[in-house]
């Protein structure tokens, strides 16, 4: 009966809280700190680019010492390596972003075309470790959305379970087409 269903739905809706967020919900600082710690040595090497009067020479110095330091540069533009991002190169070819870290020339192209070289040379950033901590905090907002969704899923699941109502945790749209 439709009237009975509406009454139950209204009761269900009245039991939901305005929010499901506690203070520990906003940022997972343990995860953020670990992500930064994992690349800290490379970031410290890249710190020498900050304020460099001859950016290319500074890049060459790092390259000759440890070219792997550049493999973390994607995070400086808020991209994670595991996302396997692709970009269009200067001639329109679709290439992996990580290919920008395979030579001094490609690193220079990355620094120039992203604007990051100017940011570093003009010292708009003072320390890449702190800068990446901020980026990681920003990237954690997507994880926050996922955390919020999971908390709400569990809240609704508990309400339905306690009411003895059978349900499926997830239903995919392809099942309805």
Q: Which residue ranges define each predicted feature?
A:
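A short, surface-exposed helix-loop junction/capping segment
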Residues: 129-144
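N-terminal, charge-rich interaction modules
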Residues: 141-155
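Terminal, low-complexity, charged helical segments
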Residues: 130-133, 151-154, 174
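Nuclease-adjacent, charged terminal/linker segments that flank catalytic cores
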Residues: 1-126, 139
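Generic structural motif recognizing short loop/turn segments at the entrances and edges of beta-strands
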Residues: 125-129, 161-163
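A short acidic/basic microdomain associated with nuclease active sites
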Residues: 161-177
């Amino acid at each position: 009966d439709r009237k009975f269903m509406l009454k139950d739905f209204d009761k269900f809706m009245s039991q939901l809280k305005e929010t499901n967020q506690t203070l520990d919900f906003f940022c997972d600082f343990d995860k953020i700190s670990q992500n930064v710690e994992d690349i800290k040595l490379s970031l410290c090497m890249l710190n020498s680019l900050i304020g460099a009067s001859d950016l290319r020479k500074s890049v060459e110095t790092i390259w000759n010492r440890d070219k792997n330091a550049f493999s973390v540069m994607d995070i400086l533009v808020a991209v994670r390596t595991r996302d396997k991002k692709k970009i269009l190169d200067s001639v329109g070819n679709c290439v992996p972003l990580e290919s920008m870290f395979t030579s001094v020339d490609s690193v220079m192209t990355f620094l120039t075309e992203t604007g990051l070289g100017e940011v570093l040379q003009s010292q708009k950033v003072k320390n890449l470790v702190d800068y990446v901590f901020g980026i990681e905090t920003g990237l954690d907002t997507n994880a926050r959305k996922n955390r919020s969704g999971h908390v709400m899923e569990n809240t609704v699941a508990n309400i339905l379970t306690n009411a003895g109502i059978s349900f499926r945790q997830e239903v995919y749209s392809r099942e309805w087409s």
